[in-house]
Amino acid sequence: MVTEAPATNDPRELVVWSALEEIPDPEIPNISVVELGVIRGVAFEPLPGGGERVTVELLPTFVGCPAIGVMREQIEERLRAMKLATEVAVNVSFAEPWTSERISPEGREKLRASGFAPPALTGPSFDGPELQMLLPVAECPYCGSRDTTLENPFGPTLCRAIYHCASCRQPFEQFKTV
């Protein structure tokens, strides 16, 4: 379920999607908000008094994600500068949960190149408190080894865990599979 610009007849929507591809995630600047899969949609709508509003739906990776405010500001600033509409709205949406399956293949490669292990493509098929301890083995983004151990399921942000590679002896973070 990778997020991509949808097929649309409105060329302005494609322009907005292209602009969003240039907005970096505040915590990992090598990956864009589109590659991370946090953009749910883009829409133009007429305003009652004339003019139009462009609305971007933003999905947080986790409830309380500290980067959401920065993402929202970056998107608003960029779209206002483009002057495609009289108003810009960025709505944080909980209509559907963000999952790690929304990260694009390019985004996964950029995570790896930045020293982060991308989340597994498929996660455990159960729920419960044991979930974090039964995460799939993480592949080291530095040497590719799977001889890794989970050091702490609580990384610097809610969406990351800390691992250690026994082969190259490097600590690294993995995006959690959700």
Locations of the language-model features?
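Residues immediately within or flanking Cys/His clusters that coordinate Zn2+
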Residues: 137, 145, 162
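Short linker/helix segments within small regulatory modules
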Residues: 152-162
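Short metal-binding segments enriched for Cys and/or His
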Residues: 167-178
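Short, non-transmembrane amphipathic alpha-helical segments
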Residues: 61-86
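Short functional micro-motifs and their immediate structural scaffolds
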Residues: 145-149, 173
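Short edge beta-strands and adjacent turn/loop segments
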Residues: 30-59
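Short cysteine-rich clusters marking metal-coordination/redox-active sites
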Residues: 140-143, 165-168
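N-terminal presequence-like segments and adjacent domain-start helices
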Residues: 1-22
